[in-house]
Curated annotation (Swiss-Prot):
A GO cellular component entry from the record: cytoplasm
Annotated site, Important for enzyme activity, chain positions: 184
In-chain residues carrying the UniProt-annotated modification Phosphoserine: 130
Family (UniProt): Belongs to the peptidase C12 family.
Record protein name field: Ubiquitin carboxyl-terminal hydrolase isozyme L3
CDD domains: Peptidase_C12_UCH_L1_L3 (cd09616)
Listed Gene3D superfamilies: Peptidase C12, ubiquitin carboxyl-terminal hydrolase
Chain spans, region Interaction with ubiquitin. Crossover loop which restricts access of large ubiquitin adducts to the active site: 152-159
Control of this protein's activity: Inhibited by monoubiquitin and diubiquitin.
BP GO terms, sorted: protein catabolic process; ubiquitin-dependent protein catabolic process
Compartmental location: Cytoplasm
UniProt organism field: Sus scrofa (Pig)
PANTHER family for the chain: UBIQUITIN CARBOXYL-TERMINAL HYDROLASE (PTHR10589), UBIQUITIN CARBOXYL-TERMINAL HYDROLASE ISOZYME L3 (PTHR10589:SF24)
Amino acid sequence: MEGQRWLPLEANPEVTNQFLKQLGLHPNWQFVDVYGMDPELLSMVPRPVCAVLLLFPITEKYEVFRTEEEEKIKSQGQDVTPSVYFMKQTISNACGTIGLIHAIANNKNKMHFESGSTLKKFLEESASMSPDERARYLESYDAIPVTHETSAHEGQTEAPNIDEKVDLHFIALVHVDGHLYELDGRKPFPINHGETSDETLLEDAIEVCKKFMERDPDELRFNAIALSAA
């Protein structure tokens, strides 16, 4: 992806919550850490949960899987509800922001926005756009990149040089119309992972996260955060 490049966001609830606050989201939903994937640790996550963001490494194994998955879906097809808000990623390192947009856009009816919210405005103006049009609109939407840069510098680890190649990537896992969708701006379409509900979203999303980890057992760079009712 040549063209625009942003500083990467951390999978850090403090950073993501501050970012959403700057975008005009009322803190009635907040990101929290998912400390582990077994039932005992998942029980510590406040409920309800309306989205999970997974940060994972883009490895050779993953890229092989991604290509195979894409080809399989193209040949076999899949059901995707038109209610899913999905956008492509054309800006390098913007996957964290796009993950947040995917999480909020697909739960807009649960969110409270402050008056003049730049995120609400972006979602309203891009509602009828195609995934590619939304990507181009984000490139020209000045308010979000400025906020993103501020948040990238607020992380616990030092922000990398903007030209540095980053091999970590965010995806969002959300519940729309009874199904669990993986939303990844690097992919041509949402991935339907089967049935879910508001009550089981966290557990169902974590099952998908586990598959990412199983594909790369030598990798440790996985991190999940959940969007929970505050």
